[in-house]
A protein has these predicted regions:
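Secondary-structure boundary/capping motif
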Residues: 1, 98, 163-164
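C-terminal substrate-binding/catalytic lobe of Rossmann-fold NAD(P)-dependent oxidoreductases
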Residues: 14-17, 22-155
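Alpha-helical support elements that line or immediately flank enzyme active sites
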Residues: 1-13
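Short, glycine/charged-enriched secondary-structure capping and boundary segments
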Residues: 7, 33-36, 169
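C-terminal catalytic/substrate-binding lobe primarily of soluble NAD(P)-dependent oxidoreductases
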Residues: 103, 146-179
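Short, solvent-exposed amphipathic alpha-helical segments in soluble enzyme
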Residues: 8-11, 105-109, 170-174
Length: 179
């Protein structure tokens, strides 16, 4: 979910630094009831707790978009919902920002070849509304915000399993075409 968002922002505004928070549906390695786990927070009941934990997403971005290596950090908050997550990225850029400029960049990107990967919504929806959405990121333009001239916040929904499965199908199609 973070990669398409970071790509659009970096291409359009040149990200200097940022911090992401993923509000993530609980996962299969979490406990249903309080139990044992090497991470004491993940040992707590997933269905009854907000669980702060680490994420590799911010570091992986540097592998996907080399110009962002070391510029993003992040955390995950596992929440008691079974599916659909939200990533929020607070970022500073070299170029001046406005809510309109940010939303326009995402809307233009979503109309191109990448429309299967990134979508935008202007509707005030909640997590369940994105269940089985095939896009990797759905930018919620109603949540875009700017402070000053170069600090912004973007929010993007994603159905982690379904979006990933759709990208794997895209790769299979591509491999079939080139073979």
């Amino acid at each position: 979910c973070l990669a398409p968002v970071a790509h659009v922002l970096n291409e359009s505004f040149e990200i200097e630094k940022g911090f992401m928070t993923t509000i993530h549906a609980f996962t299969s390695d979490q406990r249903i009831l309080d139990n044992s786990h090497k991470d004491p927070r993940r040992a707590r009941s997933a269905s009854q707790s907000i669980v702060p934990t680490s994420t590799g997403a911010s570091k992986a971005i540097g592998e996907i978009i080399p110009s962002l290596k070391g510029k993003l950090e992040g955390v995950a908050m596992r929440v008691p919902t079974p599916n659909v997550s939200l990533v929020e990225l607070v970022f500073c850029t070299k170029k001046d920002l406005s809510i309109e400029k940010i939303n326009s960049a995402f809307q233009n990107f979503s109309k191109g070849q990448e429309k299967k990967i990134l979508e935008t919504t202007q509707e005030k929806l909640v997590s369940i509304d994105f269940n089985h959405n095939p896009a990797s990121s759905i930018v919620d333009t109603t949540l875009t915000n700017v402070v000053g001239k170069n600090m912004g916040k973007i929010s993007a929904w994603y159905d982690n399993e379904w979006g990933f499965s759709n990208r794997m199908c895209d790769i299979a199609e591509y491999l079939h075409k080139i073979s």
